């Protein structure tokens, strides 16, 4: 809604921010065309461009040379951060991260089961089916690819929560989250019993979300991460060293 008392650029910027918070505009996806945004928001092209300039200045919208504008990733922990270093050198950091994942992903699954749209479920299903196909062609898929598919499945559920603070929180920890998934894949996927357990738990999460069973989905997601934590801890108790190499996600995207 237009406000005569405020600069038009601020009004436009706030309208676009609301689309981001509501999940209409998603992190990393190209923005709709200027024409479509103008039609949706009811502003002129010149006003829209002024608003986008404000958002670029705030770091909310980014435009790479020769590419479309998109919603920026907010507050991401970079692969050079102290947390990434601690992840690869200090055993407790992995377990602390898994505790955080259990809380955040449990809530993501609960909200996704409650608020997820059919379009969200299509994305989740696509990610789940790709993950299943990779498991069936185990010898042809690298561990990093397995981890990417696993991470994408959990991220799709998070995005279906439509809680943008939760989405931004998880995305700000993308490299850390991916490395916890990679640690799980690297240390557990070659153990048949643990791999079957992970597959069953992924199926429970998927089915509970799509069947709109929020509390079942929350419990399934939490149990999954906590089981991974226990299995990794058991490996260390057996006297084996965990593989916990820090691998920035963006360096491994195909």
Curated annotation (Swiss-Prot):
Could you state a single Gene Ontology molecular function term? DNA binding
Residues forming the HTH gntR-type domain are 6-74
* DNA-binding region boundaries: 34-53
What UniProt keywords apply to this chain's record, in alphabetical order? Activator, DNA-binding, Repressor, Transcription, Transcription regulation
SMART domains tied to this protein: FCD (SM00895), HTH_GNTR (SM00345)
Q: Relate the induction remark in this record.
A: Is constitutively expressed. Is repressed by the presence of glycolate. GlcC exerts an autogenous repression on its own gene.
In a knockout, what does one observe? Abolishes both glycolate oxidase and malate synthase G activities. Is unable to grow on glycolate as the sole source of carbon, in contrast to wild type.
> What's any GO biological process attached to this entry?
regulation of DNA-templated transcription
Q: Please name the PROSITE patterns in this protein's record.
A: HTH_GNTR (PS50949)
The UniProt transmembrane annotation reads none
SUPFAM superfamilies found in the cross-reference section: GntR ligand-binding domain-like, Winged helix' DNA-binding domain
NCBIfam families per the UniProt record, alphabetical: PRK09990.1
Protein function: Transcriptional activator of the glcDEFGB operon which is associated with glycolate utilization, and encodes malate synthase G and the genes needed for glycolate oxidase activity. Also negatively regulates the transcription of its own gene. Glycolate acts as an effector, but GlcC can also use acetate as an alternative effector.
**Which PANTHER family has this protein been placed in?**
GLC OPERON TRANSCRIPTIONAL ACTIVATOR (PTHR43537:SF1), TRANSCRIPTIONAL REGULATOR, GNTR FAMILY (PTHR43537)
What name does this protein carry? Glc operon transcriptional activator
